[in-house]
Regions:
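Active-site-proximal beta-strand elements of phosphoester/diester hydrolases
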Residues: 8-18, 107-119, 153
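Structured beta-strand-rich core segments of catalytic domains in phosphoester-bond hydrolases
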Residues: 43-46, 50-120
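Membrane-anchoring alpha-helices and their flanking helix-loop junctions
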Residues: 115-119, 123-127, 131
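Short, flexible loop segments at the rims of nucleotide/cofactor-binding pockets, characterized by
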Residues: 13-19, 88-89, 127-130
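A long, amphipathic alpha-helix that forms part
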Residues: 126-147
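N-terminal, active-site-proximal structural segment of metallo-dependent hydrolase catalytic domains
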Residues: 1-57, 61-64, 71-73
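Short gly/ser/thr-rich secondary-structure transition/capping motifs
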Residues: 19-21, 92-95, 134
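Acidic/histidine-rich, metal-coordinating catalytic segments
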Residues: 148-155
């Protein structure tokens, strides 16, 4: 483990609301706060548009699941490459929304999520949110059963 002089790992979550537009602020925040792991939501870019080189220039390695124009999640780690474990929330092979990414980093399993909004009540988006939450609950139970250091974070 390379994180922190005390062996502690600092994990943060940041809804960037568009990584291209907010990249300067994200870099500033990463340099100021220096989390060991940062989970990003709403990166709002396709995979090929993710600024991995800009983040690597300040010491962060990344994995990401992009989606054009909305959604999208990423997991960054300072000085260590996150190892992808799960891309997309299990349980619905037809769900194409980029809202769940899971990785091993610094000996911890980290899941970064961007939860569906689902407003207003009674709509298809609300029903999707409820199904998504059921799937998240099922995945959380699976992760707990592993009895490994695990964190689920996001927005």
């Amino acid at each position: 483990m390379n994180a922190g002089s005390t062996g502690a790992v600092t994990i943060a979550s940041f809804n960037v609301n568009g990584i291209k537009a907010r990249l300067p602020r994200l870099i500033e925040w990463l340099e100021e706060t220096r989390p060991d792991v940062a989970c990003l939501q709403e990166i709002k870019t396709q995979d090929e548009g993710f600024p991995a080189a800009d983040l690597a220039a300040i010491g962060y390695q990344a994995i990401w699941q992009g989606q054009k124009g909305f959604n999208g999640v990423a997991i960054l780690a300072r000085g260590e490459q996150p190892v992808e474990v799960q891309r997309g929330l299990p349980g619905d092979p037809e769900d194409e929304q980029s809202r769940y990414l899971e990785a091993e980093v610094f000996g911890i399993r980290v899941a970064g999520i961007y939860l569906p909004n689902g407003n207003p009540l009674g709509t298809d988006t609300y029903a999707y949110k409820l199904r998504w939450l059921e799937r998240l609950h099922a995945r959380a139970k699976e992760l707990l059963a592993l009895e490994e250091a695990t964190i689920i974070t996001g927005d």
